Amino acid sequence: MTPSQWLDIAVLAVAFIAAISGWRAGALGSMLSFGGVLLGATAGVLLAPHIVSQISAPRAKLFAALFLILALVVVGEVAGVVLGRAVRGAIRNRPIRLIDSVIGVGVQLVVVLTAAWLLAMPLTQSKEQPELAAAVKGSRVLARVNEAAPTWLKTVPKRLSALLNTSGLPAVLEPFSRTPVIPVASPDPALVNNPVVAATEPSVVKIRSLAPRCQKVLEGTGFVISPDRVMTNAHVVAGSNNVTVYAGDKPFEATVVSYDPSVDVAILAVPHLPPPPLVFAAEPAKTGADVVVLGYPGGGNFTATPARIREAIRLSGPDIYGDPEPVTRDVYTIRADVEQGDSGGPLIDLNGQVLGVVFGAAIDDAETGFVLTAGEVAGQLAKIGATQPVGTGACVS
């Protein structure tokens, strides 16, 4: 059996025990328990950022946040059950007690499944625990709960998921969707010395954005697409009011003239930018093709990362703000180690042509990255001539 199946069995077992408790507690006790779970989870999500912000280790931060939420959820549920049982004791009529018990079973099942879902959601964004994230993402039971959850309820764990997303990259897939992984050979390490890397390096720039509303400095990569124009990811400049492009070691002030959070693409106007533009490939890449990711991982030095195309797919998932309404994009999945800071960088073929724009990495598979295809971003090229500044929306998290 898979870890996901064991997780489903565990959740259903706890739900069965909860159903017995619901029979004894009755409808009111179970409803109060449900209210206690929601209040406990909400309190945990509100308190967690202030408490775990003092913890530097990502793994310790994850488990500290989950322990806090679990403790408050348990306190809320127990308080609700105790209050409910006190009221139930006043019901003497046997038929009414029977109806009360049946309703209690149903409500208590909802309580436990909701609590399990609330605790599992942050784990789907934990890059520090890829095996655990994979098990949670593969859970059929939790996936059904996620489908049934109302939009307002999904905002409760969303804040904590953003806090615990240590990858620095926005979620690409729905919380309980597994990354599609087509097996391909390991990338060729010799690609870093291919002459095409040195030839394209000047046109790949580092981007630093100041987002004072969320007290963040955002770092990513971009590349020249026409004279004085740079393409990058929207999440690299989200919420910013000051953007600087670095060509080599020289800084250039930039203005965001196009911002699309659905596709996750932004275009920057950068006057007097000297590097020449890169050219987009006319033909799509095939599975197994040698390719290279160019970027500034971690906001550090220019790095060429060997990669290999897994497949080209139509991928459905959230936009950069995690909107519940999914967007569908043409994407390459690649075998490569994509890191924070690579966002917005080009994926090039061995002719130096751009196959797409890097925009994410898989949580449940450390060797898989996501790239918007050249065809997907082609529509954005119509905005190259824009000159007026546009808004950059809210901060991503």
From Swiss-Prot:
Modes of activity regulation? Inhibited by reducing agents and activated during exposure to oxidative stress.
Inactivation phenotype: Disruption leads to an increased sensitivity to acid and fails to maintain intrabacterial pH in acid in vitro and in activated macrophages. Growth is also severely attenuated in mice.
Membrane topology note = Multi-pass membrane protein
Q: What is its EC number?
A: 3.4.21.-
Q: Where is this site: Cleavage?
A: L160, S161
List, from the UniProt record, the residues annotated as the active site of this protein.
Answer: H235, D264, S343
Instruction: Give the free-text PTM comment from the record.
Output: Autocleaved. The autocleavage activity is significant only when no reducing agent is present in buffers.
One Gene Ontology term of the biological-process aspect is: symbiont-mediated evasion of host immune response
- Give the matching SUPFAM superfamilies: Trypsin-like serine proteases (SSF50494)
Q: What family does this chain come from, according to its entry?
A: Belongs to the peptidase S1C family.
Q: How does it assemble?
A: Monomer.
Please identify the protein, giving its name as recorded.
Answer: Serine protease Rv3671c
Q: Which organism is it from?
A: Mycobacterium tuberculosis (strain ATCC 25618 / H37Rv)
